[in-house]
Swiss-Prot record:
Keywords: Mitochondrion, Transcription, Transcription regulation, Transcription termination, Transit peptide. PANTHER family: CGI-12 PROTEIN-RELATED (PTHR13068), TRANSCRIPTION TERMINATION FACTOR MTEF18, MITOCHONDRIAL (PTHR13068:SF113). This is Transcription termination factor MTEF18, mitochondrial. Disruption phenotype: Severe growth and developmental retardation. Dwarf plants. Belongs to the mTERF family. One of its GO terms (biological process) is mitochondrion organization. The gene is MTERF18.
Length: 558
């Protein structure tokens, strides 16, 4: 009864907030209307779709928004509402999949992404439904099946018998029912593969059994799905980082406190922090497992001096000076949370990570600024004050934070770069990620941004197209961007492509014996470019304008 009241309360809240404009049902009758609508849907699914009463009720009682939308289609009257519902359902069949997907825990705003195309009734395709019934029959909470579906849809294309057989094989390894459910919810792909367990999944469950036995010897588990799910999700963090490393499993057995004292979010944040060093995921995981004290380090708030931090890690003064000369835009102050990218921006990430993993992880916690004014730069402070007083303060501060995140320090160079980059912090991050994913190393991207900040003003697809053209049609490598970073700032269709193709045509036809660099071809002003063509032959500019400079004709030139 208590659970029913909770469901009613949840639906009533949705009803009153989202449906405020429709006020067809008086407040005192909302619970009544919801109950009758749930009962009508239950009867509809049970009688017309031949679902078991239990399954029909599960769908009806867990689809709050769909129920609300149904109620809003009818005029409410206490004596006739049940009859109105039945009549409406007779003439206006519901999209049964919509109710189903919401009921298994998928947020209603996302349901449309999962609806099968041109199918409304379970009778048209029972595959997903039958898989859900098999999972539910084993004991999976109905409203948690949506998590499984979103992460691993292949689970739901298997036959019920295959699912049941697979689940029983997990129990044969020595797992209780709730342990199987919690583990599979945490690692959904373990449910894929039919009735037989592959060697990888069997090996995983054997290792998990050993780990859980070690945990349970201290009576650390409550015998319910949520308890097993919570611990399994934490274990999955390390499993995803290096599932084949035997040392990792041994360390997990020895460091039970990691999974009991710290939240999943805390573990993910720490793992993510060390992954940002650009090292292997396995190394990041092992650093935490070998040194669990790291979990107590504050790696977010402390302010650092880049110079001071490098010396703290053992760099000599001459080494620091050399780094500062090559990467001046990284120096000044920053925050410890940005340290991994700061080190990648100066190509010292692997060296410093090796120092940390070789027994010096404590250096992250022992660093402090020498004095309150250490590494404060006046030009930066003045620029920051201007930002604080600007009308677009929030927008600019977010962009500045992005630059600090990728390694730019609190210095005048960073402020100059900031003046030239446009877009939201999210957009800047996406554009930066495109460059990184293309294969340009982190430190070189930062150098490119320092030299040509407007690189970050290009849309992701534009950056991809220009890089593809550079490496494909132009036949050059990404390294050329170090010579000519502004290449990415020019228009591909109206500048880069037509000029390059015209130059290529001139060489092929024998009009020009000189081979110009990409920078010379692209960056030369229009006036100088035309003058160069005229110098080759007075008739060449006319040919350029008629056959190459127009977007309509440039792709048809032979």
């Amino acid at each position: 009864m208590f659970m029913v009241r909770l469901k009613f309360a949840s639906i009533s809240h949705n009803f009153s907030t989202v449906a405020a404009k429709h006020r067809r049902v008086p407040s005192k009758y909302k619970s009544l209307a919801i109950g009758k609508a749930q009962q009508a849907i239950t009867d509809y699914l049970h009688t017309t779709r031949s679902l078991s009463y239990t399954h029909a009720e599960q769908i009806a009682s867990n689809a709050s928004v769909s129920i609300r939308n149904l109620i809003l289609k009818l005029d409410f009257s206490v004596p006739t509402f049940s009859k109105s519902l039945r009549k409406h359902l007779s003439y206006h069949p519901i999209n049964e999949f919509e109710f189903f997907f919401e009921s298994i825990g998928i947020d209603y705003s996302e349901v449309s992404e999962f609806l099968p195309e041109k199918k409304f009734f379970f009778s048209e395709d029972r595959t997903v439904l039958d898989a859900a019934f098999a999972l539910s029959g084993f004991g999976f909470p109905w409203n948690k099946l949506g998590k499984l579906y979103k992460e691993e849809r292949l689970v739901f294309v298997q036959r019920p018998g295959e699912i049941e057989s697979r689940l029983l094989k997990f129990k044969d390894i020595g797992f209780s029912t709730v342990a199987v459910i919690g583990t599979c919810l945490a690692i959904p792909r373990t449910l894929c593969g039919g009735g037989e367990l592959g060697s990888e999944i069997r090996c995983l469950f054997v290792k998990l059994k050993r780990l859980f036995d070690e945990f349970d010897s201290h009576h650390l588990f409550e015998e319910n799905v949520d308890s097993w799910l919570a611990v399994s999700r934490k274990i999955r963090i390390f499993y995803d980082l290096g599932c084949e490393n035997e040392e990792m499993w041994e360390l997990m057995c020895r460091n039970k406190s990691l999974f009991l004292e710290y939240s999943e979010e805390a573990l993910m944040n720490k793992a993510g922090y060390f992954c940002r060093f650009g090292v292997s995921k396995e190394d990041a995981a092992l650093l935490i497992l070998r040194n669990p004290a790291i979990m107590n380090f504050d790696l977010e708030k402390p302010v650092i001096s880049v110079t001071g931090m490098l010396k703290h890690f053992g760099l000599r003064q001459d080494e620091v000076d050399a780094v500062a000369q090559k990467y001046p835009y990284v120096f000044g102050r920053n925050q410890l949370k940005n340290l991994p990218y700061v080190l990648r921006a100066i190509d010292l990430h692997e060296r410093i990570f090796d120092i940390l993993k070789n027994g010096n992880h404590h250096l992250l916690a022992s660093y402090t600024l020498m004095d309150p004014d250490e590494d404060l730069e006046r030009e930066y402070q003045e620029g920051l004050e201007e930002l604080q007083n600007s009308r677009t303060k929030r927008h600019n501060i977010q962009k500045l934070d992005f630059l600090h995140e990728i390694g730019f320090g609190e210095n005048g160079i960073t402020m100059k770069v900031l003046q030239h980059v446009h877009g939201t912090a999210v957009e800047l991050h996406d554009r930066f990620q495109i460059l990184l994913n293309s294969g340009i190393i982190f430190s070189k991207i930062c150098m490119l941004i320092r030299s040509a900040p407007k690189i970050l003003n290009q849309k992701p697809h534009s950056i991809q197209d220009k890089l593809r053209f550079l490496c494909g049609e132009m036949g050059d490598s990404l390294d050329y961007l170090e010579v000519f970073p502004a290449y990415l700032c020019f228009d591909l269709e109206n500048r880069i492509s037509p000029r390059f193709r015209f130059h290529k045509w001139l060489v092929e036809k024998g009009f020009s014996e000189k081979s110009y660099s990409i920078a010379s071809i692209v960056a030369t002003s229009e006036k100088a470019f035309i003058a160069r063509l005229y110098g080759i032959h007075p008739a060449i500019p006319k040919h350029w304008f008629e056959r190459f400079s127009s977007r309509k004709t440039r792709d048809t030139v032979s």
